[in-house]
Amino acid sequence: AREFQADASVSLTAEGRIIAMEAAFRNAIGAYSIFPRSSVGDSVHAATQLGAPYQMKRLKTSASTFWQNKTPSGAIRGVGQPVPCTVTEQLMDRAARYLGEDPAAFRRRHYLQGASFPLTTHGGVYMDRLSLTECLDLLLDKMHYKELRKEQLALRKKGILRGIGIATFIEQTAVGPGLYGAAGVPATSIEETRIRLEADGSIRVETGATDQGQGTLTGIRQITAGILGCETEAVEVAASNSSGARGGGAWASRGLSLAGEATALAAEALRDNILYVASLLLQAEPA
């Protein structure tokens, strides 16, 4: 289990705009660091992802890791990312309360906007594209936010306290060599797919991805069939063969994101080869 402490603050302008966030994280990890990803990943994510969804001019964070005479903790469930989310969202709630502003509206006007993307946050996290405002508006509509607020006030007059919480969580997933290579972590994080057209017209796919019930292999079969224009029943997928295609495993929501992309690239290459050979046989231009 995680064992974090954080001292955090948010700075506002006289007009109620966030200009900075600051936090010092302390993370106890147990008796030793877990190989190969180590036990400091939680601390790194906490320090780099504080305030990630929001506009601000400055960010200051630090993270300290402590040894303990107890069972070590490692990379579990989001690897530290729930920690900066929890701290950030508490700061947002307190700032909104201080200003007397609705917490949802306060978040909306501080969100990173579509025109700002792609961007690198103050914590060094690259973001290609996010639709934060659209997601919030959809959420508020689905949960009937205005009606809930009215009901909340009515219940409060009767002495019944009901809380309404909103949080914006950005999770870094589908990680590969760009993260692990740069961090020097000795963990395989590539994904490889090999696709072959068999003599009987069937398609054989070798993937390094693993599937423990997520449906990854079904997705790979569908991607292959869609690009090659064949029935899914004609596609055979072979996985988890150490002498076959290489892969990094199923973690960090990366299975279909990376293996699926590798499959798409391989299927497109095979399709181009099929069309080229067919054009030679038929003496026609590839379609």
Residue ranges, per PLM feature:
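Beta-strand segments within the central parallel beta-sheet cores of soluble alpha/beta enzyme folds
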Residues: 1, 19-24, 103-112, 150-166, ...
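Short acidic (Asp/Glu) and glycine-rich catalytic loops that position anionic groups and cofactors
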Residues: 67-72, 111-120, 200-203, 244-256
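Helix-loop-helix junctions that connect adjacent transmembrane helices in secondary transporters/permeases
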Residues: 111-202
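Glycine-rich loop/linker segments at domain edges
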Residues: 3-90, 170, 181-191
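Flexible glycine/proline-rich, aromatic-decorated loop/lid segments
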Residues: 27, 59-64, 109, 185-190, ...
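Flexible loop/turn segments at secondary-structure boundaries
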Residues: 28-32, 113-118, 172-177, 203, ...
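Phosphate/diphosphate-binding loops
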Residues: 1-31, 138, 145-147, 260-287
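Alpha-helical support elements that line or immediately flank enzyme active sites
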Residues: 38-49, 75-110, 134, 138, ...
